[in-house]
Amino acid sequence: MGVFLVYKPKLLFLGHHLMMSIRTSAHCISLFLMCCFSTAYAEVDLSKAWFNVGFYSAHFDTDKGLRNANPGLGIEYALDDKWRVTAGQFINSDNENSNYLGAYYQPWQVGDIKVGVVGGAFNGYPKAFNGGWFPAVLPVASWESGRVGLNVTFVPPLKDRLYGAISFQLKFRLKD
């Protein structure tokens, strides 16, 4: 009984943390979808919607035991040739749930590759802002062909709070 009482608060905390993470993710994705697909639009153009299943992060600090495969679920929606909005959730390099909400601005193009920045907010990194939301602006390059695309993002290291990496995000769309 004494062991149960010692661990019960931790279990309650972890359960609460998990539920808050799920609620936060649902709220972020719901807000994103409302903005993109509100009734102000007569029709949703699926050729502008890209879906991804997370990231692969090639970390600079290979000896830290970080998670390179970062599975998740996200959406990216093109507003025009330069602007896109994005939202999603993934398991980050610290093996925690992270959410993101942001926008891509890619004004330059070199051949088939668009170049610019992605800015927004992230959460879920225990050493960065106690796991809370924080802003980020990151350089990004994107390649798209038909129904397949790839975003490559440089994530700079942030002292002992966030580990640096080159992040690869494979994306798909349902319609050309």
Q: What is each stretch, according to the model?
A:
Residues 53, 73-77, 87, 101-106, ...:
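Residues on the lipid-exposed face of transmembrane beta-strands in outer-membrane beta-barrel proteins
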